[in-house]
Amino acid sequence: MEATIESRIGLKELADKVVSADQAAALISNGDVVGMSGFTRAGDAKVVPMALVERAKTEKFKIDVYTGASLGPEVDQFLAQAGVIRKRGPFQGDKGIRTLINNGEILFADMHLSHGAEQFRQEIFGPMKYAILEAAAITADGYLIPTTSVGNNPIIADVAENIIIELNISHPESLIGIHDIYVPEKQGERQAIPLTNASDRIGEKGIKIDPSKIKAIVISQEPDAPSLIVPPDEETQTMANYLLDFFSSEIKAGRLTKTLAPIQSGVGSVANAVLDGFADSEFEHLQVFSEVLQDAVFNLIDAGKVDFASATSITLSEELGKRVYENLDQYADKLVLRPQEISNHPEVIRRLGLISINTALEADIYGNVNSTHVSGSKMMNGIGGSGDFARNARLGIFVTKSYAKGGSISSIVPMVPHVDHTEHDVDVIVTEQGVADLRGLAPKERVPLIINNCAHPDFKEQLWEYYNAAVEATGNAQTPHILNRAFEMYDLLEKTGSMKK
């Protein structure tokens, strides 16, 4: 056995468990429920899933796949297109699998990311036969050291009947010590989660495992798929500037200080642009308590703006990832990776008083937000953690451009055809047109703010015409709607290719 591999397997009785990816994949049977590591391209199982794809070329079988969040795009895509996946959850981010979900070939269980662990404990999806978990090391005292994400790995390792480990020796050993693995007690016996600051460490260095459950160890050197951060354009930069101005106004109102509150930011170019904007802002000594740490977080650490960052995953561009992982020791005292059961836990989010920034597909004139379903029917990626954060944060902020498809679609509509975040969970909406602060407002007070500040000028007249007609038709009801007209813009889109009258 190579010295590098031997040094990563501290439990020497496991040395004879090292097998090929094909041998490990052969252990999985048709109909199995399989848990896999992976959260937004990071720390995902890679080589055994691809061996399953190869196996599917000569053998017909299907499995249910549950993870922390999305796997690397190739893994989800190839598993789906090989016909291996019957059902998938709780989140995905690949066009290939999305197409098969939306034509009915794959079932998809979309859920709040904080809910997964409890559902696995209760075997809601059935007994989990196998876990396939990427690890940087297995320590002599029986801890599995995750790589660049933790996600649902602790609970998957606990409930799975059998475990396959992908020992990825391309990840640096300096990852040891980055993780903080805390698993709550059973419901009904549970104590308060003792986390009162984003930088607190409350758990253990790795995932305690039962060695008897480990059926195979596969050596991997496959890197994580790098993030594809789209550089901010003029409009995303404008949105970022609006948000920074909003935070400044909150300081003037006495609700925040220059350190703000711990920040949660969703994945994507707008969120990254907002974080980048902090570099030249008045804000300082910031903390991040999020799901995913993107490029901008490390740039802010380097700039001395962020003191500490907590998440469940690190997802970086290729260039920055190389620099960070080659110098991980420099960040060790400023980072922690936790299970998503903790990073997304409502109790912790409420206690820390987070500022939550997530992306919407669209919002309606009363402040309801659709994050998941295009035209109400076709799944995009999933709700992810946006619901965990929006409902429980100090500030639940949603960002979106005011239009889509070159201006033929309005992102502000009379009534969203699918609701992920109700009007009660949405504090602020930001588009490139402006900001709507909805806190404390009645439905009819929100309408002028959302239409005037956030809607694209091409659609404002249509939106006002609908609202005024709804007020008249309902006798000025609490939340005026004309149900047989509420989706007129979608009817127009379907018939003409545009929402414009």
Regions found by a protein language model. Give the residues of each.
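Conserved alpha/beta enzyme-core scaffold
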Residues: M1-K501
